[in-house]
Amino acid sequence: MKAKISEIFESLFNSELRLILKNPISIGSISEPSEDLQCTAVRLDEHAINMISKPCERAKKYVILKNPYHIKFMDNPSEELQILAVSKEPDSIELIENPCLRAKFACIYSKPENIRYIKNPDKEIQVSAIQKSPCLISELENPCEAAQLTAVLNTPDTIFNIPQPSIRTMLVAVEKLAGFKIFPSDKNLDTITGIITQCYKL
């Protein structure tokens, strides 16, 4: 990106700005650069942020807006930065060590399928994604019971896509598929388990 005309004029009276306009990476040679200098440097070259020992939040935003994947190189990025990154590139959440819950929601907001990028998704995230797309239950390694129930209540035959459904999930699914209530006795639950097991083998 090119320098602004106003920056060029200002650089006539500011040697540090003049240095950065010539070579943004040279900000590393400036002790405690101002926020404006940091932002100018990263706007011209996003990699300049690696030369700043304590980059300001505004400079970080400039970088994330240009390249969301740069969040990988930021220590403890703020919630706002995490959300900004995953809103632009959902799979960038894989580069965040401990993504916040709001960033996870932002990741699946437009496409619930993006849950595949989230390691060990929280219960709330699982349920939110499954509400939008019940068939996604098959992509969850260990879906929580709430997510299982959400799936079968919306689409009963998703029971056959759940590796180890809970007894309660199987009961609800069979009731939905059969169209009538089933008394949850031990005998009935054993029968339901057998039915589901047999269906898996089909």
Describe the residue ranges of each PLM region:
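Alpha-helical scaffold segments
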Residues: 2-202
